[in-house]
Amino acid sequence: MADLLKIKLKISPEVHSQEVGGETVLLDLNSESYFGLDEVGTRVWQLLQESEDMQSVFETILTEYDVKEEQLRKDLKVLVEKLLEAGLVEIEE
């Protein structure tokens, strides 16, 4: 994957989301699979709905949560890889 902060992500139109108790449940209509996001994953998902720019997502999460830049970069990379692998998001060219 290219530099995480330089990519733009687009949420698949086949994915529907619903917040439940501070977490988010994602339903992929193509695979009929459910996915769950914790509190921070939910915030990332909300930010992706507002902006496809990972740099903006990174900066917002960094200011809202008590996390070091290096750890956030690693955690976002893992989350983005899982979302891509599941087909929930796509990289914008």
Model segments located where?
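Long, charge-rich, low-complexity alpha-helical segments
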Residues: 33-93
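Acidic, low-complexity/disordered tracts enriched in E/D and polar residues
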Residues: 1-42, 46, 92-93
